[in-house]
């Protein structure tokens, strides 16, 4: 993950944290309900969209998640949403459009559409408002980031300091 991230402008710590959240670093992980597979749990349609032919191939999965993250970052930035690890992970999980809709709903206090509501409910947010779900997601991401930092340190891996996190 660290090696593949060197040629991109994506923070390796973010990529490590995402792999920890999505699959606990298991490249053979599979969600039997959604069909999501691999290190970053790409669903088949997203895998195809980002050229991921074999989601169980870690190198391919890392290259695809870098492309996906860059696309998500561009959409978040264009929408005026801060581009950081927690928001990029929210965009990975909800789709960039879903993340933007969540932020807009949180700002306006408006209800969410059925698809986003269903996604929130399926991801531990049953009964939460958009704002509450975003805050829960940020806390979850930061908790996993801290755990990932500990794992990396325990493995004796030194990461370069990265701004914007």
Map each language-model feature to its residues:
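Extracytoplasmic and endomembrane cell-envelope/extracellular-matrix remodeling and assembly machinery
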Residues: 3-6, 105-165
């Amino acid at each position: 993950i660290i090696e593949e991230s060197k040629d991109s402008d994506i923070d390796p710590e973010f990529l490590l944290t995402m792999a920890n959240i999505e699959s606990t670093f298991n490249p053979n992980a599979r969600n039997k309900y959604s069909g999501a597979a691999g290190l970053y749990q790409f669903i088949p349609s997203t895998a195809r969209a980002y050229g991921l032919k074999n989601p169980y191939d870690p190198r391919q999965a890392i290259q695809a998640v870098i492309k996906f993250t860059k696309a998500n970052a561009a959409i978040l930035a264009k929408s005026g949403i801060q581009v950081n690890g927690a928001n990029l992970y929210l965009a990975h999980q909800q789709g960039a459009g879903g993340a933007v809709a969540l932020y807009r709903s949180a700002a306006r206090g408006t209800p969410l559409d059925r698809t986003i509501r269903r996604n929130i409910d399926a991801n531990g947010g049953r009964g939460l408002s958009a704002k509450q779900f975003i805050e829960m997601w940020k806390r979850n991401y930061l908790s996993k980031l801290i755990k990932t930092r500990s794992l990396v340190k325990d493995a004796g891996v030194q990461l370069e300091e990265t701004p914007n996190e």
